[in-house]
Amino acid sequence: MESVEMNNPNSQTLDQPPPSSNGDTAPLALDHMNPQNSESVALNGSSTPIPDTNGSSAKPELLRPLLSENGVSKTLSGNDKDQSGGEEETTSRRKRRSRWDPPPSESINNPSAEGGTDSGTGTRKRKSRWADDEPRTQIQLPDFMKDFTGGIEFDPEIQALNSRLLEISRMLQSGMPLDDRPEGQRSPSPEPVYDNMGIRINTREYRARERLNRERQEIIAQIIKKNPAFKPPADYRPPKLHKKLFIPMKEFPGYNFIGLIIGPRGNTQKRMERETGAKIVIRGKGSVKEGRHQQKKDLKYDPSENEDLHVLVEAETQEALEAAAGMVEKLLQPVDEVLNEHKRQQLRELATLNGTIRDEEFCRLCGEPGHRQYACPSRTNTFKSDVLCKICGDGGHPTIDCPVKGTTGKKMDDEYQNFLAELGGTVPESSLKQSATLALGPGSSGSNPPWANNAGNGASAHPGLGSTPTKPPSKEYDETNLYIGFLPPMLEDDGLINLFSSFGEIVMAKVIKDRVTGLSKGYGFVKYADVQMANTAVQAMNGYRFEGRTLAVRIAGKSPPPIAPPGPPAPQPPTQGYPPSNQPPGAYPSQQYATGGYSTAPVPWGPPVPSYSPYALPPPPPGSYHPVHGQHMPPYGMQYPPPPPHVTQAPPPGTTQNPSSSEPQQSFPPGVQADSGAATSSIPPNVYGSSVTAMPGQPPYMSYPSYYNAVPPPTPPAPASSTDHSQNMGNMPWANNPSVSTPDHSQGLVNAPWAPNPPMPPTVGYSQSMGNVPWAPKPPVQPPAENPSSVGESEYEKFMAEMK
């Protein structure tokens, strides 16, 4: 360093004036961190030695500020070089502070270090290029922030509490016996306490564990009080403050302290807990019903059950505890029943909850609360009060005393009936009966519908309200105004005028339309200038068919006339006619039909009117087919019923066959006879034989002549015939009038045991006819010459002989 000083021509001492040129700037200071180099700092120009930190003497030196051309101090950076050259800078860079050197005594930003001597090392510090231009201000934290910086943890008291907390937690979790004191050092045991199962609760181990738990809770509470940032364990429960307030039941046995504290449905107790934040419960003898003790067997033993009746107040803070205790203490002081406002409020609240409160009743005359109707001050006044009825809208009486409150439903029924009347519908029979029953006065007609009465007359509708029941005035109708119902939906007023203008002068014609949609409602009104015109229009247009609708025309306002139930329709002639009695054999007899109304009852022995189903064609005249004698040809598809014992029965309706679909259908109207020649030429021969045409299309329901007591009229005699009757259905056993047998009966059924009478000789042409079928009307025949009973007995004897 001395060589550097000697070789530097620009170095000057402090006693010399500073140079004016730029080349007189002081060189950079040497590394002041090394104390060995402090004595060689001669470039400051100080000749007075000063003691070094190591004890060596050094010259006192002053730092000369670096001045620029304008006189402002200049700071050189690492790259800045002045006229002194780079030797000093190279020397200063070689000597850097080690990381193990002690820290400097002053900051590089200390202004005193720049202006004079360095108190720590006596050297000037070089400013780094990364140093801040302005020094940072030191922040002084308040005292309460020290708790959050972690410095509070080093408090001896907190450390002692933490160590004790860890020790207690270790003892509780180890499972080792907590009370291991010898026999002589133990304290006397308290009185044993047993649970509901007879097991002792307060054992030595249990008491030791409870003692450690209480101590642990207290330590945690103290740590939280000293260090609010302390996080307690998860199982920590803050201890609650509690206070017992005994109820003076012995001093005041008849006073209801519990009711005043709990209140109606517990509302008073809940209100005090909500206002104070404390918990208020009643404990002791008598606080729990006797039946509840059996339900609490599994619960923890509560030593307060054997204490006197008291109120237990629990709170987390002392303020909440004192507030709740003050409220309860006021209720524990007995007060006279007359002056007990608290009890009166509880009773009012209970009545409100039960819905039986009566303090808010209003007077029915004036509507004001506070007095009854009999004590109303405006009882004798005649003015109308401000009360408005919600039913009739009238003042002077409340809604509950409305005289027409019971007629709301009847009014709706009347409106509905008016609506039906406008639509042209009929009135239900029940409404007519009801109006007849509720007739008012002796002169009122019970047949009028409800809308025909004067419903707006309040006196007649309610004669029991002080009014004299009088006959309601009859409603006057405008005979010239007509109601027209069931109009087409597209009919307008002009169309209505054109429809009814032919009956006279029309004063007004209107089709009623919907106000919202603008469409026709289906009815309207026409007003004529004269009553005669209106009556003519009613007679002509009522029931008139117009565009697929039947118009209903009547006087407006009047109910439609009652419609009588329609009678049974007159019987119409069937599609196939019945020939008269003088037509050829095989046809049906003629029937007489009434043109209208009710028909007369049929003759008891005659058959009922057959159904209107198609019947079989009439048989061809005799001689068309000649069956071979001796050949058995039963009817096609015919089924015979089993023979009934000794009783003549009619065939069931389902035993007949329909005619073949290939047969042509032919109908004869009543009164028209079938021509045998025409029938012969029009009917083709049948391939199934002559018996096929003998079956009707659908059997009608038959009558049983044996059920009637009347005797049928006598029949005219019939000539004998030599025609073969083996294929004739007239010989069937269920025939009512069988024909007389002929000599050839080889293929007939007349000898069947169930035949009641021997057959009679039919007329010519009955061999293939249906005239002898029992459900067909029989032509008049003469009674047989021989006795039918003797013939029946002979046939029965033949049958019995064959059976043997």
Curated annotation (Swiss-Prot):
Belongs to the BBP/SF1 family. Residues 559-587, 640-654, 776-786 have a biased composition (Pro residues). Necessary for the splicing of pre-mRNA. Required during development and for abscisic acid (ABA) responses. The keyword Metal-binding applies. This is Splicing factor-like protein 1. GO terms for molecular function: RNA binding; zinc ion binding. Residues 480-558 form the RRM domain. The modification Phosphoserine is found at S84. Residues 446-464, 625-639, 657-670 have a biased composition (Low complexity). Residues 1-139, 175-195, 437-476, 556-595, 623-695, 709-804 are annotated as: Disordered. A zinc finger (CCHC-type) spans 363-378, 389-403. One of its GO terms (biological process) is abscisic acid-activated signaling pathway. Signal peptide: none annotated. The lineage of its organism: Eukaryota, Viridiplantae, Streptophyta, Embryophyta, Tracheophyta.
